[in-house]
Amino acid sequence: MRRSPRFSPLWLALLAGPLCSGLVLASPEVHLYVDGKPVAEALTLDKGTVSLTHKLDKGSHQIRIGDAGNSCGTSFGPTEAKPLPFGTAQPMDKCAKGTSFTLRVMLAGDYEFTFNPDTPSLKVLRATRKSEFKRQPPAEPCIAWDGGPVTVSLKGVWPDGTRLRDAYSKQEAVVKQGKLTLTPSKESGGLLLLEPVKAAKQAPFSWDQASVYFLLTDRFHNGDPANDHSFGRQKDGQDEVATWHGGDFKGLTEKLDYIKSLGMNAIWITPMVEQVHGFIGGGEQGNFPFYAYHGYWALDFTKIDPNYGNEESLRTLVDEAHKRGMRIILDVVMNHAGYATLADLQDLGLTDLTQNSGKLPATWNQWRPSGGLNWHGYNQFIDYQSPDWNKWWGPDWVRAGLPGYPQPGTDDVTGTVAGLPDFLTESTKPVGLPPLLAAKKDTRAKALPNASVSDYLIAWHTDWVRRFGIDGFRADTVKHLEPAVWAKLKQAGTAALKEWKAANPDKALDDLPFYMVGEVWDHGVAKDFWYQNGFDSLINFDYQREFALPQAQCMAGSDPTYASYASRINQDPEFNVLSYISSHDTKLFFGDYQDVPLQRRVANSFMLLPGGIQLYYGDESGRGLAKDGGVFDQSVRSDMNWQEIGSGEKAELVKHWQRLGQFRAAHPAIAAGSHKKLSDAPYSFVREKGADKVVVVFAGRQP
C-alpha cells in the first residue's frame, strides 16, 4: 500500500497559504522507532490517542516516536534519556531529537504502545494474547479416524448380550462376539464413553475421586455490587490489572448449579479473610496499583473481607454447596501476612509509621503517582526506620526487614516470600495478640493462654471450620513451614469439622474426616514425608508442564501417564495428587494457543485422568488472558467470561466439558480405579473399581 506523502514543516507552512487554500492536507504521520528502526504501522497525529502492538525480544530496547527526518514538532521522546516504565504514561518532548526511552523487556512477546500526541505521552503494556499472532502447537503424530463406525474388542470385559451406552452421544449397542460397534459423535473428538445401561449402584463420595473447581472469588461473579469498594478501595481507571473486580460469595452461590453441571464435587475458594485495605506498587516498575484481591495478603484472620461478603453469605454458600453434594475447600495462608499499605496505616491509626503525610490526600488510599513517579512512589510516605513498628505485627510475630524485628533468613522456612512479613511459625514461645489486632476494634481475635504464633494461626483458621462446616483446606506455600505445624493444623481441622457435624447433623454430607491438600511448589507424583504430616493430597505440577499439551493433541499418547498414575495412586489408599492444566500462579492452557478445538481435546485427556483433578475457572469456557501490566501471573486471573458462553463455540465448549465431567462424576472407577489398555487403534482402555466399570475408546484424530 502506498503511504500518504510527508512534508517538512517548511513545506507545510507554504502549503497552508493561499496557493493551496483549496486542498485537503494529509494528516501528519509518525512512526514508533524501536532500536533506531521504524515500525511499519504509521501513527496519525490528528486522530487523538492511538495504539499499536509490536513484538519485542527479551532485553533492553530504545524507544521513541518521530518522522524519518527527526524533525522538531514531530520527534517525540524524553527530555533526557530515561527508562520507560510499564503501565504509566510518560511525558514526552515533541522536539526530542536525540533522546529515547530505554524499555527493559523481561519476557519476549507482543507489547502495546499507547501514544497521546496532545499531551504528549507514551504508555507501554504487555499486550493481551488477543492481539498476538495465533501460535500453532507443535505437531504431534496421532492415529486417524475417518468419522465412521468404530469397532472395539471387549472380550473379557463384558459378556455378550450386555447392553452398553455411549454416555456422550446416548447411543446404545449390545456386545456381540466380544465386540461392540458405534460411531462416535463428531462433537466428542472421536470418543466413546461406554457404560452399562444397567448401572451399578453409585458408591458414596470419597476424596480419592476429588474433582475440584478452583476459582478466584473476586474474578468469578459479582452478586452484590454494593460491596465492591470496601475500605475505600478504588479502581485505577486504566487496565484494572490488580484492582478488586467485584466477585463475591453471593455471586458464587448464584453459579453453584453451573459448577455442579461440570461434574465437580468440590470447590476451592481463595483465602477469604480480611485483606490489607490498600495497594502496593505492581511489578518491578510499579506499573499499576496492586490490591489483595486474590486473598493471600491477610490483615485479620478472624474476619471475612467485606469485598467477598459477610458471615451470612458465607454460611449460605457452604449450605447451598452441601445441598448439591459439593464440598468447600478453603485456601489458607499460614506462612505470611500482608504488606503495610497507606490505607492500613491510616485505618489502624498507625500514623507514627509515616512521613511527609501532609502531602497525602485526606484519604490516603486516594494517592496517585504524579511528577514522573510510579505506583511504588507510595513508599516515600512510609518511615521504614521508625522505632514504632513494634505497634504493627511486632517482633514476636513476624520476621521482616524492620527495626527491632528478626531479620529474614535464607532457607525456605526463615526466608520471606516476595518480601511479605514471615510468621515465626517455628517458635514455641507463648505470645499475646499482635499489637495491630490488639488495637483493632472489630477483630474477633482473643488472647489465648500459652499460645505460640502457630497456635494462634491454627485456632483462627479452624474456627471457620467449626462455625461454618468448611470441608477441607488447600494449604498455601507448604514448604515454607515446618511439617509438624501442618500436622497440627490437620488435627485441629479434623476435630473442628467433627464438632460442626455433631452440632449440624441435618447439614452434614457424610462422616468423612477433614481433607487437606497442599501446594509444595514444583511437586510431582511422589509420596514423601508431607503425607505423614497432615496432607491427603498434594498439587501435581508435572501434568501441566509435561503432559497436558501432547496428550490433548493425541489422547492415544496418554496411556503411559494413565497407567502410571493409576498404579501409583490408586493402589495406595493414603496417596493422591491434584492435577491441573491451568492455575493462578502458572499459566492458562487456553492462553497459549487460543484454540477452541484444542481446548475440547484437552478435556478428553484431562477429565479421564486417574487421581484427583483441579479445574481452574474458565478452563471449560476458553477464558482468555487479561492485561498483566508486565507481571505474568496477573494475565491468568482474568474475569470469568460469562458473556461469551451464552451461545456460539464457547457455549458448545462448555457443553463438551459438562459431558466429560458428568461421566467422571458418575463413575468412581475413572479417578480411583485400576487401568488396563485394551487396544492401540482405536485406543481403548478399561477402568474398574468394585462394581463400577467403564471403557473409553478414542477412535483417533480426524484430518
Placement of each model-derived feature along the sequence:
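Substrate-binding/active-site clefts of carbohydrate-active enzymes
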Residues: P204-A210, F220-D463, R467-F468, L489, ...
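Conserved, mostly hydrophobic/aromatic
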Residues: L164, L215, I259, I269, ...
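Short, solvent-exposed loop/turn elements at domain surfaces
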Residues: V39-A42, C72-T74, F220-H229, A526, ...
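Gram-negative bacterial Sec-dependent N-terminal signal peptides
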Residues: R2-V24
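Active-site-proximal helices and loops of the catalytic beta/alpha 8
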Residues: E132-K179, T183-G190, E195-V197, V318, ...
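Loop/turn elements at helix/coil->beta-strand transitions in domains of secreted/extracellular proteins
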Residues: D208-V212, K260-I267, H322-I329, F468-F473, ...
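Insoluble glucan recognition modules
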Residues: L19, L23-A173, K186-V197, S211-T217
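Acidic glycine-/aspartate-rich tracts in secreted/extracellular proteins
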Residues: A68-G73, R219-H221, H667, Q702
